[in-house]
């Protein structure tokens, strides 16, 4: 009697799509793990016994940073602690439940700091003027004070490679400075050390990773400020370059890591008479008094 033939179930379009999604997610996670791990090693970002505070805004970058650091923590050669912190600035319409619900599901220690900096910014900044400078200084001042009070040794921010390049061009175009965001920034008084674990990661990879991981993204509705508009112009320029000239952004980023002071024109970095390098000005997180009374909030320039 012939054996009964059983037909194997055909793959449905949905299951094939899910398989491709899973493969893409695994590939992206490996790439981001590698890039974050390399940045941590290259710049000595995290050391044994560190307490790392991941600053979460609810955007794709900070979600991805926390996710990758939690992943790396499991297999890291050194033991370090991770906590997540969000500053609720009391922006109208900010969904207060989203981050706590997500962080509860992740099982990580977290803190939500409630400070109404939104009202301060609206009160102090004239209509039509950029809010970014004051808003970021107030935000960082609060976060840095919190870090010191809670024994945090490293403050992790979610800036990625594209942010570093955009900041370089913003400073060149509008500030007359050859200046970007460093992967690690130490304060002069030793209070704070800021790290940027995503320094090697591309924004488009982070955006796709966040989409595949289905992070509960919270949009920022506070500003349509001039600084953000200027940054958007540069971002669009980079996107055009990336399409028309693949590899250009990678080469530009390598230039940030390969500076030759003798071929620039800054006498603070190079003694052109003696033909030797100088120490230059040390850039760091500096505590500064606000120009106006903003209450008991320290303003830190970064």
Curated annotation (Swiss-Prot):
Keywords: 4Fe-4S, ATP-binding, Cytoplasm, Iron, Iron-sulfur, Magnesium, Metal-binding, Nucleotide-binding, RNA-binding, Transferase, tRNA processing, tRNA-binding. It comes from Marinobacter nauticus (strain ATCC 700491 / DSM 11845 / VT8) (Marinobacter aquaeolei). The gene is ttcA. [4Fe-4S] cluster binds at residues 132, 135, 223. Its main location: cytoplasm. Belongs to the TtcA family. Its EC number is 2.8.1.-. Gene3D superfamilies: HUPs. Catalyzes the ATP-dependent 2-thiolation of cytidine in position 32 of tRNA, to form 2-thiocytidine (s(2)C32). The sulfur atoms are provided by the cysteine/cysteine desulfurase (IscS) system. One of its GO terms (biological process) is tRNA thio-modification. GO terms for molecular function: 4 iron, 4 sulfur cluster binding; ATP binding; magnesium ion binding; sulfurtransferase activity; tRNA binding. It catalyses: cytidine(32) in tRNA + S-sulfanyl-L-cysteinyl-[cysteine desulfurase] + AH2 + ATP = 2-thiocytidine(32) in tRNA + L-cysteinyl-[cysteine desulfurase] + A + AMP + diphosphate + H(+). Homodimer. Binds 1 [4Fe-4S] cluster per subunit. The cluster is chelated by three Cys residues, the fourth Fe has a free coordination site that may bind a sulfur atom transferred from the persulfide of IscS. This is tRNA-cytidine(32) 2-sulfurtransferase. One of its GO terms (cellular component) is cytoplasm. A motif (PP-loop motif) lies at residues 57-62. It is an enzyme of class 2 (transferase). It is found in: Cytoplasm. InterPro entries: Rossmann-like_a/b/a_fold, TilS/TtcA_N, tRNA_Cyd_32_2_STrfase, tRNA_thiolation_TtcA_Ctu1. The thiolation reaction likely consists of two steps: a first activation step by ATP to form an adenylated intermediate of the target base of tRNA, and a second nucleophilic substitution step of the sulfur (S) atom supplied by the hydrosulfide attached to the Fe-S cluster. Pathway: tRNA modification. It comes from the Bacteria. Its cofactor is Mg(2+); [4Fe-4S] cluster.
């Amino acid at each position: 009697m012939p054996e009964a033939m059983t037909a194997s179930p055909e793959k449905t379009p949905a299951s094939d799509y899910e398989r491709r999604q899973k493969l893409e997610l695994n590939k992206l996670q490996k790439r981001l793990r590698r890039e974050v791990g390399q940045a941590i090693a290259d710049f000595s970002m995290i050391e044994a016994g560190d307490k790392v505070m991941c600053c979460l805004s609810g955007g794709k970058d900070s979600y991805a940073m926390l996710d990758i650091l939690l992943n790396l923590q499991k297999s890291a050669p050194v033991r370090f602690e991770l906590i997540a912190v969000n500053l609720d600035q009391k922006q109208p319409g900010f969904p207060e439940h989203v981050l706590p619900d997500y962080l509860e599901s992740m099982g990580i220690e977290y803190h939500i700091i409630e400070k109404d900096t939104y009202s301060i910014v609206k009160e102090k900044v004239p209509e039509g003027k950029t809010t970014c400078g004051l808003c970021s200084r107030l935000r960082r001042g609060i976060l840095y004070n919190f870090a010191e009070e809670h024994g945090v040794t490293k403050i992790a921010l979610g800036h990625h490679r594209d942010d570093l390049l955009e900041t370089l061009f913003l400073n060149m175009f509008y500030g007359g400075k050859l200046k970007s965001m460093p992967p690690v920034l130490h304060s002069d008084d030793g209070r704070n050390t800021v790290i940027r674990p995503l320094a090697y990661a591309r924004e488009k990879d982070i955006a796709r990773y966040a989409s595949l991981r289905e992070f509960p993204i919270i949009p920022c509705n506070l500003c349509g400020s001039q600084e953000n508009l200027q940054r958007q112009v540069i971002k669009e320029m980079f996107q055009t370059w990336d399409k028309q000239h693949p590899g250009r952004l990678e080469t530009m980023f390598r230039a940030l890591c390969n500076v030759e002071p003798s071929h620039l024109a800054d006498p603070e970095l190079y003694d052109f008479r003696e033909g030797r390098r100088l120490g230059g000005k040390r850039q760091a997180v500096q505590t500064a008094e606000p120009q106006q009374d903003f209450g008991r909030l320290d303003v830190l320039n970064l």
